[in-house]
């Protein structure tokens, strides 16, 4: 499962970002949820948070290092997920010793798999629960506190659908909706079916009722979740519902009839069960997004057979062809495993060939991770790490070039974005905001004070990179939404609002700039457009190099040097070049050799280094031009004055000194501009950080939202 095209998406296990505090000021016990792994775990974590809040706990304040209750929702797909869990548990051990009232709970797939090992490796853990009984968490915490003993409860079968539990959603504008739990496939690399169980499907009525409820709360986008969504309908939990192979296509069409639902996504389908009725439903239902994430895993039929993936490369490519025929602009992404046991160079070459033919918008690539308990762990031909790494790097290089070409083709196109929060890791530094296009691509656009996460904007793509797009041309349209209102509640920024002077022609200084940007009442102030332009120019200046304005001043240095040295007449028929070259009797008599040497130095430094500064855009060369011209020009003047041979009114090589002083003034001006620019950029970054903090709705700690699940955790 996946959404999003960032570079980090290739390796989703980055460790959770920790959020902080212990006891709430009111005395209510606080909690913190740290999530590892796939979207299914993210969905479950929202339910865990909802259960704790329903039981009277309060989410820990943003920035807190720990809380009264810390819950780890774990992943068992890759070995590094194990390592990160136990590393974080070890980090909490001293806190647990110093605060015995603190409780630690471990749930999810790893807890389901290693129920005894968790307490053996981390005996300070209070609760261990599995994937099938997340609704038991509040009871288990209370029981552990009362009995002063660890509680381990692992159910072997699903007790209730997580979607029926209370939820504390991470987003006001987007929501996960689980349509099934478990998986009926038996991929040899995957441990998930043994941990999540056989597939069980929710009834369409239950799913649609949840979607309508979410839309009534202001949600604009839902993602339908399942380990294999296009197997939906084969194993309904309600025995009264007949087996229905076409149920998923009908579910998509039914979502299209819900008023107010702007976008529908789903993840993940299995190629073996992908049918044309789903393609037709995607193409014919306006709010179903033109995006498809369909795991390939390998382009080699031999490896696919060893993986027990019941399709072959040509079938997979045929599905892609039919999707693109129905939706030419669909973004298709995939999962790929490198280094599966027995993979030969020929097998890997077949994968590269399929990647070239498929032209994926993005591919989430993973190095095979040997997991005990899976059939693949017992296969012969385990690939050396160095070989896997080398193949992985080649695959990533190929896919990045394809992704870049695909994104570059979008430059100049108009896109609709659902403005997101937390998507752009550098938004605060670049004074940008981020959003997702309908095809799932991540777009960073110029920040606008009126736009909130959850709003919809249209803009034009101006730049491209392999994992994101840039839209710096400004916003064409902006639609405020109830989800945006939820992210910017009334009065949330009252403390930062101050009275600003009325609009005028005066350019604001830093303090006035902050006043303008902080005050929501000024969103129509025409000064803001000019200020945003100033910020962009400031960023370029601070980043280094000589900007277009500075280049004009350096050109003026060249003009003055040339005028002073060659063109302007001095006295009578003696001109500048006569002074420098000594070609005229008057020039030779007027200026001795040392003066001419210094005059030449002034010319070389003024013209030569100023020209180099223009070509290379290096400020250091401009400073050399300044220093050399000033020294040479001043020395030439002193040489002339000391000999007292200069004709009356003849400035001679003193033009070098004049040019030097002009250069001094120009560079002082440029230095002041850079100082101003740094101030503006710093203020912009501070303001953006303040906005992000104000918009953050919760502090549940998610490892990688939105990040792809490892292919072994999906289909």
From Swiss-Prot:
A Pfam family that the UniProt record links to this protein: Radical_SAM
Cofactor(s) the protein requires to work: [4Fe-4S] cluster
SMART domains in UniProt: Elp3
Domain MTTase N-terminal span(s) in chain numbering: 29-146
Start and end residues of each stretch annotated as Unknown: 517-715
UniProt EC number: 2.8.4.3
Domain Radical SAM core: start-end pairs: 169-405
Region named (Dimethylallyl)adenosine tRNA methylthiotransferase MiaB: 1-516
Molecular function GO terms recorded: 4 iron, 4 sulfur cluster binding; metal ion binding; N6-isopentenyladenosine methylthiotransferase activity
Domain of life of the organism encoding this protein: Bacteria
Membrane topology type: Multi-pass membrane protein
Tagged with keyword ATP-binding: no
Keyword Translocase among UniProt keywords: no
Annotated residues for binding of [4Fe-4S] cluster 2: 183, 187, 190
Catalyzed reactions per annotation: N(6)-dimethylallyladenosine(37) in tRNA + (sulfur carrier)-SH + AH2 + 2 S-adenosyl-L-methionine = 2-methylsulfanyl-N(6)-dimethylallyladenosine(37) in tRNA + (sulfur carrier)-H + 5'-deoxyadenosine + L-methionine + A + S-adenosyl-L-homocysteine + 2 H(+)
Cellular compartments per GO CC: cytosol; plasma membrane
Protein family according to the UniProt entry: In the N-terminal section; belongs to the methylthiotransferase family. MiaB subfamily.
Subunit structure: Monomer.
Annotated protein name in UniProt: tRNA-2-methylthio-N(6)-dimethylallyladenosine synthase
